[in-house]
Amino acid sequence: MDEVEFIIRLLQDNWSNASTITAGKKDVKQANGNAWTYTPTPMFIDIRSLEPGKGKRVDLDEKAVVIVYEDSASVSHPTIDRAVRNEEYSFTLHLRVLHRRDYTELTYSRRLLQVLYQMARHILEKNGLRPKVYDSNNNLEASAELIQITGRSEANDRGKRLLGYKLSVSMKRFGRTI
């Protein structure tokens, strides 16, 4: 499992747990004023994927999208004999929501984007120290030592009615044997 898959699986595997935790937050409301009770699972996309519907053209009418791609990687060898290595990876998580023209409430997409951001942040912060991803048989598939969000920027396109955040995420693995 490579690092981008690791981030995607970490988010996917923990999304339903995070939605029950964030459901009912007082500061995030639905159009009718009630607390959010359901947060749809977005489509997670590895930018390198060649699968149909998960590449250049994605239908945002049905689901929000989280696009994950690796920006950089660095390796250092902290010992003289170079028997172990430390790895550091930088990723961008691009959260995207389309405001459809049939939405009667004009701030719905903005609030949905805020909920998606809060859930992604909650998952990454909760699993920030020694995150692990397991396979279907509950066997450890991959792990890291540290994941943290290092920044957030707006990525909106009013003409296309796309709202988004770009999250910068750092992942570190220490003492990996060669």
Model-predicted regions and their roles:
Residues 1-82, 130-137:
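Small/polar-rich, solvent-exposed N-terminal microdomains that initiate assembly or binding
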Residues 7-11, 45, 66-68, 91-95, ...:
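Hydrophobic beta-strand residues in large extracellular and virion-surface proteins
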Residues 83-103, 160-174:
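Oligomerization/assembly interface segments of phage tail-like spikes and tubes
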Residues 104-110:
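A short acidic/glycine-rich loop-to-helix N-cap element
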Residues 113-172:
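Acidic-leaning, charged glycine-interspersed low-complexity segments
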Residues 178:
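Long, contiguous binding/interaction regions
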